[in-house]
Amino acid sequence: MRYLVQERIFSFTADFWIEDENGDRVFFVDGRAMSLRETFELRDASGAIRVIIRKKLFALRDTMDIEDGDGVIATVRPAFFSPIRHRYEVTLADGSRLEATGNFADKDWELTSDGRLVGRISRQWFRIRDTYGVEVGPGEDDALIIAIAVCIDRIHEDEERKRHEQRPFGGGFGQF
């Protein structure tokens, strides 16, 4: 199944809908970015919370947890330095791992488990600004894969913002 994620980057609340390939609204991301701890709720079309995404406050690397009613089901973080390409790792509650590799700035990457494709994220399927597609592999948990995509997108944006802020004079003309 393929989903359309259209973020409202400049929205005060960071809320946005996720549509299926038929254009039906199937998930709603309720962003609580203004809270002390960045939190998102992924709700289904009826309003029921499927998962909650929380940014960890105290972690060496930017880290987000995905929780359901029973607790943390996945933890998403950047992989340690990889000279070949950017990577993110996802640790599931049962200890298994997923790996995300690709071009995160262009939103064109894959999510694999032991070499098996479980999800693909691509901006190339759509020509709408701030929009990308999430394709979920057969038999995979749609809400979990979408939540992982939201986490990686958010962590990557935070990393890019921090990198920009670390440049001399913030990357701009500076203050004189």
What is the predicted function of each stretch?
Residues 1-176:
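Intrinsically disordered, low-complexity proline/glycine-rich segments
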